[in-house]
Design a protein with these regions (language model features):
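Terminal substrate-recognition subdomain of acyl/acetyltransferases
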Residues: 2, 146-159
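Conserved GNAT acetyl-CoA-binding A-motif
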Residues: 105-117
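Acetyl-CoA-dependent GNAT
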Residues: 7, 11-87, 95-104, 135-143, ...
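Conserved active-site tyrosine of GNAT-family acetyltransferases
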Residues: 128, 133
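Intrinsically disordered, low-complexity, positively biased terminal segments
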Residues: 110-111, 134, 159
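Active-site acidic-Proline motif in GNAT/NAT acetyltransferases
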Residues: 85-91, 119-120
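Conserved beta-strand-loop-alpha-helix junction that forms the acyl-donor binding cleft
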Residues: 115-124, 141-146
Length: 159
């Protein structure tokens, strides 16, 4: 795992929607041959998402390299999307963004993180499990395949 130059994180706003879409499409393109279609994050409305969710952008110097999209509920923080540019995958940025999500949840008084992923995204499932997420249940996905519901209890929250 090579070290990246200086990393900074900032909240996305409406002017960032195109960059969010571009990074997400690049990050998820690897899964098209695996599932035979574009994954749902590649089709999302990011103009709407930057208004309704918290999307934090991770930069290496001045280059956008990763992002995390979350929203708060009454009892947990839901991770809608994590995307890391293909050339920066495997460098620990996903782990860093998951820790960032834990901090957000704690700051909001929440003790649980939740997310969904496609069972075919085996490397992602393993990543989430490696940082303490557990599989709560699986269910058939309306577009084919299997959706994996995962959660992680965190210390310092109320849930």
């Amino acid at each position: 795992m090579s070290k990246l130059p200086h990393l900074t994180i900032r909240r996305a706003g409406p002017p960032d929607a195109a960059a969010v879409r571009s990074l997400t499409r690049d990050a998820y393109a690897q899964w098209i041959p695996v599932i035979g279609r574009e994954p749902l994050p590649m089709k999302a409305d990011y103009e709407k998402a930057v208004r309704e969710h918290e999307i934090d952008l991770l930069y290496s110097d001045d280059k956008l390299v990763a992002l995390i999209e979350v929203f708060l509920t009454a009892d947990h923080l839901f991770i809608e999307n994590i995307a890391v540019s293909p050339e920066h995958q495997g460098k620990g940025l996903g782990h860093q963004l998951l820790k960032h999500a834990e901090t957000k949840a704690r700051n909001a008084g929440l003790g649980e993180l939740r997310l969904l992923t496609n069972q075919a995204f085996a490397t992602n499932v393993r990543l989430y499990q490696s940082v303490g997420f557990r599989i709560d249940r699986t269910e058939p996905h309306f577009g084919g395949g299997t959706t994996v519901h995962m959660s992680k209890q965190i210390a310092g929250g109320e849930s």
